[in-house]
């Protein structure tokens, strides 16, 4: 539960924010990371069409992978032919799952056991709530296609024993029920858009957290992320290429907070005239994808 604000900014604005953050914060241990997300939606993209109208409540279903190999595997597996979750439909067979996973791997077996994250992102009155599951790519394919969550995890477990056990804990099963209910609210469900970016995330330095440990007004969970090389893939188009969402010199800055911004952040945002703006990666990719046929016909 937190407030997330995204802004599309230029190189100079990004440099100013990073310079201001460089005292109390630092780039996290992951450094620059390739992130690939795949959004599920109805064939008409009803979920995102409703979302861009800015209702009080909206939700998105998203699969996510971290790293180049896992991202390629995710998009390749879900894009290797039609996959539809529909009322009364049968889940993919074991052979169907294995074939799809193999088609998405650059190196056979390289990413099959790496976790992908599948969840629901809800937004109500500006507050974001996220519920997500960690599971293998084969298990994610099977679960999305209709296999019960527990069966999918048991058939294709995570390689880490502790993570595999956590995936079947009562708390995680409850999250799975919520994700499953969200999927079933939007049937039929298909892969809609893939989105990839390079991310750098900033978080407070450990010494800053220790120093402000007793400060009730200090938001220790504050994070600032910068996404660049942002591009999308239209899953509705066979062999569609990746296309840019923003200019190469731009970044999407996201500030994730559970409380008020610290003075240094307010100061740099004001100095650079960076004001809250409505920007969603899936929303912008959707609008670009929908405009593409019309552009080609003129």
Q: Where are the predicted features?
A:
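Phosphate-end processing signature that detects enzymes handling 5′-triphosphorylated RNA
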Residues: 1-298
């Amino acid at each position: 539960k937190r407030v997330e604000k995204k802004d599309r900014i230029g190189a100079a604005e990004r440099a100013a924010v990073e310079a201001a953050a460089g005292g109390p914060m630092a780039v996290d241990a992951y450094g620059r990371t390739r992130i690939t997300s795949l959004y599920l939606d109805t064939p008409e993209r009803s979920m995102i069409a409703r979302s861009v109208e800015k209702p009080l409540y909206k939700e998105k279903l998203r699969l996510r992978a971290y790293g180049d190999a896992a991202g390629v595997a995710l998009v390749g597996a879900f894009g290797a032919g039609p996959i539809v979750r529909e009322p009364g439909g049968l889940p993919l067979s074991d052979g169907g799952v294995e074939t799809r996973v193999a088609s998405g791997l650059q190196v056979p077996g390289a990413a099959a056991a790496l976790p992908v994250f599948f969840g629901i992102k809800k937004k109500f009155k500006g507050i974001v709530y996220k519920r997500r599951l960690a599971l293998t790519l084969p298990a994610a394919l099977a679960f999305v296609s209709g296999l019960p969550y527990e069966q999918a995890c048991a058939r294709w477990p995570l390689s880490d024993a502790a993570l595999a056990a956590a995936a079947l804990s009562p708390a995680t099963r409850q999250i799975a029920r919520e994700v499953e209910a969200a999927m079933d609210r939007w049937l039929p469900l298909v892969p809609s858009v893939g989105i990839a970016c390079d991310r750098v995330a900033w978080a407070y330095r450990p010494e800053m957290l220790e120093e402000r440990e007793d400060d009730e007004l200090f938001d220790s969970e504050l994070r600032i992320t910068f996404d660049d090389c942002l591009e999308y893939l239209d899953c509705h188009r066979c062999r569609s290429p990746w296309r840019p969402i923003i200019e190469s010199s731009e970044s999407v800055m996201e500030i994730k907070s559970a409380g008020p911004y610290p003075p240094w952040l307010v100061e740099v945002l004001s100095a650079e005239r960076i004001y809250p703006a409505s920007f969603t990666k899936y929303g912008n990719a959707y609008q670009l994808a929908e405009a593409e046929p019309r552009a080609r016909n003129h």
